Amino acid sequence: MKIVIVNGRGRVGKDLFCEYAHDNRGMVYSISIVDRVKQVALFAGWSGEKDARGRKFLSDLKDAMSEYDDLPRKYVLDWMRQKLDIYEDSMIGTDNIVFLVHAREPKDIKRWVEENGARALLIHRPDVEKSWGNHADDEVENYDYDYYLTNDGSLYDWERKSIDFIDRIRKESWESKI
């Protein structure tokens, strides 16, 4: 089982990367450490729009939830354990599972790497806005990533890059832990 932290500014193609990897390679699962934060934000009146105002709200709420009870991280770890339990109870096993975890902040990425043996991927797209006005989005490049991918071609090119990336890391000898 491998955990890859997926990061990049808004609108660089992270979700599409994860979708392509899942659809073409199987046993690839994507989750964000702000998934539970988004649920709380919707309850609190957030419209669901990821404009600059919405992104700042999510960033601030994530900070508060993390500081209070580490809920964003706990939610992801529990979700992973549930997925692993399904495979451990089957004949398939967990060796080829890849979890793609969306995390923005360097401190969160560092924690996943140190505590769980994750690796970190930065996705870049040359034509994307560089500043969103919140620290979570604006500081994505303040980390020394293990992998870098540039989304600068067609959708087909991006699909190929996602497939090639999954194939590559599955061949590598490192493992993650929960």
What label would you give each PLM region?
Residues 102-105:
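Short, well-ordered beta-to-alpha junction loops that form the rim of enzyme active sites
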Residues 109-115, 119-178:
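Small-molecule kinase domains that catalyze NTP-dependent phosphoryl transfer to phosphate-bearing small molecules
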Residues 1-4:
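Extreme N-terminal starter segment of soluble prokaryotic enzymes
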Residues 14-15:
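Walker A/P-loop
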Residues 11:
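Walker A (P-loop) phosphate-binding loop of P-loop NTPases
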Residues 32-97:
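ATP-dependent small-molecule kinase phosphotransfer cores
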Residues 6-8, 100:
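Hydrophobic anchor at the beta1->P-loop junction of P-loop NTPases
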Residues 22-30:
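Post-Walker A helix-loop "phosphate-sensing" segment adjacent to the P-loop in P-loop NTPases
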